[in-house]
Design a protein with these regions (language model features):
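Basic, glycine/lysine-rich polyanion-binding surfaces/domains
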Residues: 1-209
Length: 209
């Protein structure tokens, strides 16, 4: 019998102090010396779907709240549902067991095709300012909001999840950019003390949603 092994394309210079195996992924729960933030967390093991349909809102339900307006986001502790345009939305799950993808042609799983990162904590927008001309922390951005554009010169989907005392963003991009993206983020965040953090730190941040 062939064992299935799923590997995140994200690699940090430090190894996790606690980890677990889950659905053939090795999930980092905690890193040594996570500090006071800001943090970067690898979420590549989290289930992600792309949804495309000419009548997108017909697929909405209590468990899949697709926003009516483009650029808006339905954000909770369980998921982020991002309205991209008239016919397309992205679904990013945060839970360990989100359930099966609907058996409908409109849904495509993108988990292993993309990078999924969370950047959050104090000074996180000072870090992002060094990596993009998009004004993610500016007054015209009302969380939760989807922003699509270049981040470290890479096309990304970015959700500005929160500002205030617990600011942060979520972002996805093509899997092939993982190494360069992580290197650029940590390099930009070095002066602010940015460090890798595990899934448990991310869960604490998600409690505000």
């Amino acid at each position: 019998m062939v064992a299935i092994i799923r590997r995140s394309p994200v690699v940090f210079d430090v190894s996790p102090s606690r980890e677990e195996k889950r659905d053939h992924w090795t999930v980092a729960l905690e890193y040594p010396g996570e500090g006071e933030g800001p943090w970067i967390t690898d979420l590549c093991h989290k289930t992600r779907w792309d949804v495309q349909d000419g009548d997108l809102l017909s697929l909405a339900s209590e468990t899949l709240p697709i926003p009516e307006d483009y650029g808006r986001v339905a954000l909770s502790q369980e998921m982020s549902v991002n309205r991209m345009n008239r016919t397309q939305a992205a679904v990013w799950h945060f839970t360990e067991n989100p359930g099966p993808m609907p058996n409908v042609a409109a849904f495509t799983e993108t988990t292993e095709a993309t990078v999924f990162l969370a950047l959050y904590g104090p000074q996180v927008f000072a870090v992002t300012e060094k990596l993009t001309s998009l004004d993610l922390g500016g007054p015209d951005t009302e969380p939760p909001q989807l922003v699509q554009g270049p981040f470290s010169h890479v096309p990304c989907q970015i959700v500005v999840a929160s500002k205030g005392d617990t600011p942060g963003i979520l972002l996805t991009c093509s899997r092939g950019y993982a190494r360069d993206m992580v290197h650029a983020i940590l390099d930009a965040g070095r002066e602010f003390g940015m460090r890798p953090a595990g899934e448990e730190r991310f869960k604490q941040w998600c409690n505000q949603f």
